[in-house]
């Protein structure tokens, strides 16, 4: 297996222009495909997850032109649901942002589809979404294990009425249903069971739907009403924001060992909830400055904090490794959905933090990290999880090197991450 050893970094200084957001890129690609008219997406993320969505759209008959650097895509919208005359199999890797929304969208039109992916995708739950789709008349079958991909879908349309979705595990189930609901046969009312996790990701979904001409009535995240008679309409140009989750590593690095780092492509008006990572970093003692399209982080005397991170679960992973450089204990709470991400992130994070010497308590939905005066050089297993690799790169900000196993797993969202980090290292 390939590995990368990062030598100790003395100081972090500079500017980073963020790659496009994964969450925004795949949502916008799907809506551009369903919309009437042509959409030009700029600052599109070039990564594995986006490639899986683009490959799927090709098989579904969508025409698009992708620029040479793969960051601009002109999509010719179908102006209707997908329809195929022959059965189609879509391989979606480990891309939850492709699997869940496509599973819902393919129920709308006509044709027979199989959705599958990598072994880990077959361990990521989809039962809450399928249950809701079936309640709306969809024809969905599990091909291997109940509640998990791969799925067989026969397009029959979605019937009007009320459905319930369990919101306690992943917001992607709700996102998937919301994006398909405007093309149902009548009004759809979605009731949320349990406490909805990752609400800011639903805000992203609703915001992008509105940019494509569809309004959703949001009753305090407990009920969503999608009136019939709406159609997705291409907005013309669509700028994909920089990826706020990816910003977290650079903002944290500056807080630990700046200098300062200016991150461009996101700012105080960003639609992504993960920009709230900067607020958490500020609570820990970092010096944060906000602009319309940038965030600056400067070194601070960091201290451990106890906080609920349910609203920013992806960026919260970066807090876990930042905690190695804080004074006192850091508690990351209400992040059960780490367990159903690219890997079981609670277990993986606890295991790897212990390798570098930290004292760690892992609970059902929390992790508590106590730093130690001296970290240990360790080989970090990344579990084919891009965020594990990027989070643990921060260990190099100590006086010890860190070895990252399978560093290319960052290609899921940020293929040139380590080059960007090196460019900031003094």
Curated annotation (Swiss-Prot):
The record's annotation in Pfam families points to: EPSP_synthase
Compartments, as annotated in UniProt = Cytoplasm
Q: One GO CC annotation, please? A: cytoplasm
State which Enzyme Commission number(s) the record gives.
2.5.1.19
Pathway assignment reads: Metabolic intermediate biosynthesis; chorismate biosynthesis; chorismate from D-erythrose 4-phosphate and phosphoenolpyruvate: step 6/7
SUPFAM superfamilies per the record? EPT/RTPC-like (SSF55205)
Q: What is its main location?
A: cytoplasm
What residues sit in the active site?
A: 314
Catalysed reactions, semicolon-separated: 3-phosphoshikimate + phosphoenolpyruvate = 5-O-(1-carboxyvinyl)-3-phosphoshikimate + phosphate
Alphabetized, the UniProt keywords read: Amino-acid biosynthesis, Aromatic amino acid biosynthesis, Cytoplasm, Transferase
**Is the keyword Repeat in the record?**
no
A Gene Ontology biological process in which this protein takes part is: aromatic amino acid family biosynthetic process
Ligand binding (phosphoenolpyruvate): 22, 96, 124, 172, 345, 387, 412
Q: Which residues bind 3-phosphoshikimate?
A: 22-23, 27, 170-172, 198, 314, 337, 341
Q: Name one GO molecular function term.
A: 3-phosphoshikimate 1-carboxyvinyltransferase activity
The family assignment reads:
Belongs to the EPSP synthase family.
Quaternary structure (record): Monomer.
Give the function comment from the record. Answer: Catalyzes the transfer of the enolpyruvyl moiety of phosphoenolpyruvate (PEP) to the 5-hydroxyl of shikimate-3-phosphate (S3P) to produce enolpyruvyl shikimate-3-phosphate and inorganic phosphate.
Q: Identify this protein by name.
A: 3-phosphoshikimate 1-carboxyvinyltransferase
Native source organism of the sequence? Vibrio campbellii (strain ATCC BAA-1116)
Q: Which gene encodes it?
A: aroA
